[in-house]
Amino acid sequence: MKRVTTRSLEGGPEVANVSEEGAGVLQSSAGAQAASDSKAESTPHAALPDKPLVTIEPSRTWVALNLRDLWAYRELFYFLTWRDVKVRYKQTLLGAAWAILQPVCSMIIFTLIFGRLAGIPTDGIPYPIFAYAGLLPWLFFSNAVTNSGNSLVGSSHLITKVYFPRMLIPGAAVAAGLVEFGIAFTVLIGLMLYYHVGLTLNLLMLPALVLMTTLLAIGVGMWMSALNVKYRDVRFALPFIIQLWFFSSPIIYPSSFLKKWQALLILNPMAGIIEGFRSALFGKAFNWTALGVSALVILIVLVYSAYSFRRMEKSFADVI
């Protein structure tokens, strides 16, 4: 028999008589426990399984626009669009009424200056509705380009924290402009009723013209937004570019007013769209050549903008 002395929880010694075999078991058990504790301390993470490292980054080629990825984030697109609509009229007294006041006030000013004082011909169309029909697609385009051009910089907190297709941000800014376009279109319906403008089959072209305007706004806005991330001068130059584009488009005058400049005017994609709007609303003959050139220019702008955006997208989170 061996005498084994142990220490109780209260700190006092306890003496117990055990056999030699029992003492050996106690010693071996204590040694195994000490070895186990030592091994656990030396390798604390040995029991954790290795996990693969997943890196999420944009594609290296612009061809892989990954429409499936864009479709997977469609709910985020709806959220961003609705956010832009709410933020645009947040803390305003008139709210969405500004979507109507802006084109209406512009129409009144243009009617007084260019319609009454300058006497610009309008091909037999009353100047107020002539000007409003040109302002409607133009204001949608210009506001969409301006808002989408600043959209990436304004959403820097999202870009630096969460992965999602960056194209959704400028696209949502353009989609929010469609809401304003729909509100302002109600005034055009009232003007058509007031001036007794008859309905023709040309109105069936309106959805196609709205689509062309939307695609052009997405192309230009997407390119400007990507440039604005790297070169912040874009936000100062963009209003000036929009202003020059306004006067080079047949908004306050018909395209027939610039007979000597028709070859250059037709290269402006908004010229074909605006004249197409008037032809659809007033039952005039379409200038299919101008519409065809506008469609071709829009396609070129859209493809080039997508290429530039995909190429610069990889550095957005680093420089924004």
What are the roles of these predicted feature ranges?
Residues K2-I320:
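Hydrophobic transmembrane alpha-helices and immediately adjacent juxtamembrane helices
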